[in-house]
């Protein structure tokens, strides 16, 4: 008779990808929010099409107006339908600190991310500065508990993004990408896809992937 350990050994290990998106009012300018919506769908489709023995999972968070929301719970990409993916509308302020607390809660919850899961990848994209008190929640996320071990990537869009804060957020300097427009958003998400794909095909998915940023031109 098969033991519980045999069953667990056969079940694919989860690899969580957690995306936090800025949907504040400034994201409406120059088609940034539309590019973000397209890029998220393309990322999920690309990961869904990848043949892997890893249980790749995606969760979507966002912040804008006066709130931060969990828009899509952590779900295996194989089970995500296109009509389930949220379409973001840009408005209001940039309450980024609330999102840090929400992501922290998810990562520390072993009912959602079990101990056997691979280290999460956290992706943050923003074109502005937090309008709430983010310092405590970001410190908790990046320095304490299981979340401190996550791979953290970020994109700063335009000159108004808080570059210094994002430099502190990412787990390595190479994971901070600066962009200026909608085209750069799509290129960044390609980079995220390549980095995650590198991990799921690696013999050691918990080791930091070293993937060069794509330097080809991408037309939306």
Task: Name each region found by the language model.
Residues 9-72, 82-118, 121-125, 153-164, 180-191:
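Von Willebrand factor
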Residues 34, 128-169:
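VWA/integrin I-like adhesion module and closely mimicked acidic/polar interface patches used
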Residues 26-29, 67-72, 131-134, 161-167, ...:
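Switch/connector loops and helix/strand junctions flanking conserved nucleotide-binding motifs
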Residues 1-15, 77-78:
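Acidic/polar low-complexity segments with low predicted structural confidence
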Residues 55-86, 163-169:
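Short beta-strand-loop
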Residues 159-210, 218-220:
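Von Willebrand factor A/integrin I-like adhesion domains
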Residues 6-10, 47-53, 108-117, 143-144:
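Surface-exposed acidic, glycine-flexible loop patches that form ligand/cofactor-binding
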């Amino acid at each position: 008779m098969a033991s519980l350990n045999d069953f667990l050994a056969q079940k694919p290990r989860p690899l969580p990808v957690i995306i936090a998106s800025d949907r504040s009012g400034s994201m409406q300018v120059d088609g940034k929010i539309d590019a973000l919506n397209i890029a998220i769908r393309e990322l999920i489709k690309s990961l869904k099409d990848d043949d892997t023995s890893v249980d790749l999972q995606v969760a979507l968070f966002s912040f804008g107006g006066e709130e931060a929301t969990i828009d899509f719970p952590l779900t295996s990409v194989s089970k995500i339908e296109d009509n389930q993916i949220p379409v973001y509308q840009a408005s209001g302020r940039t309450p980024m600190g609330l999102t840090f607390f929400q992501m922290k809660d998810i990562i520390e919850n072993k009912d959602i991310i079990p101990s056997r899961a691979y280290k999460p990848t956290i992706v943050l994209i923003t074109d502005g500065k937090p309008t709430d008190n983010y310092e405590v929640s970001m410190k908790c996320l990046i320095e304490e508990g299981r979340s401190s071990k996550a791979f953290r990537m970020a994109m700063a869009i335009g000159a108004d993004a808080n570059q210094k804060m994002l430099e502190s957020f990412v787990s390595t300097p190479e994971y901070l990408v600066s962009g200026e427009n909608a085209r750069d958003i799509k290129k960044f998400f390609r980079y995220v896809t390549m980095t995650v794909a590198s991990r799921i095909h690696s013999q050691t998915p918990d080791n930091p992937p070293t993937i060069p940023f794509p330097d080809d031109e991408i037309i939306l």
